[in-house]
Regions:
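Long, well-structured alpha-helical subdomains associated
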Residues: 108, 120-167
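Short amphipathic alpha-helical segments that mediate assembly, nucleic-acid/protein binding
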Residues: 19-23, 110-113, 132-136
């Protein structure tokens, strides 16, 4: 996934976080993986970022209010708990570091599905059974979105071909 793009879908929390909620989120990231930088930015959507500086390149999770689930459950992603969402974002870091992230825009949903599945394996001992199921459901939904996206592209291409033939 291209860095800086939010991997959390619509339906997540939008309300500003209290100092206690920010502290809880920071502690969740630290408890899952103390080696990955994570910081709060109240104006950001939660995403993994790659930063290039003169001293070198580094990765960091920047989280916003959407690190918490929303009040209405639109899809599995909107219901991901703080633990599951943090595990997912931290896994983006590891996929970037290990050079296994899919950087192409047209593979975004596939990359998100793989990230949710790998988060289960990487952080399974920290996740509840519900978190694991929600991450699996998120991966399934992302695969469905990927297939739908590909089918739409094919339909548009076929429509253009047919239009060219009828002229």
């Amino acid at each position: 996934m291209p860095t800086g793009r939010s991997s959390l879908l619509a339906g997540r929390n939008k309300a500003p976080l209290t100092p206690d909620e920010i502290r809880r989120a920071v502690n969740t990231f630290l408890g899952l993986d103390k080696n990955v930088s994570a910081r709060y930015d109240d104006s950001s959507r939660t995403a993994f970022h790659e930063f290039v500086e003169p001293a070198g390149t580094y990765g960091e999770v920047v989280f916003g209010p959407d690190i918490y689930p929303g009040s209405s459950v639109i899809d599995p992603n909107s219901a991901l708990s703080l633990d599951a969402a943090a595990a997912h974002e931290l896994t983006h870091y590891h996929r970037w570091k290990d050079k296994t992230a899919l950087a192409s825009d047209d593979l975004e949903h596939l990359d998100e599905a793989l990230t949710s599945l790998q988060a289960i394996f990487r952080y399974d001992r920290h996740l509840s059974e519900t978190d694991v199921r929600l991450l699996v459901a998120d991966a399934v939904q992302r695969l469905q979105l990927f297939v739908h996206q590909k089918q739409t592209v094919v339909a548009v291409e076929e429509g253009a071909e047919n239009l060219g033939r009828s002229e």
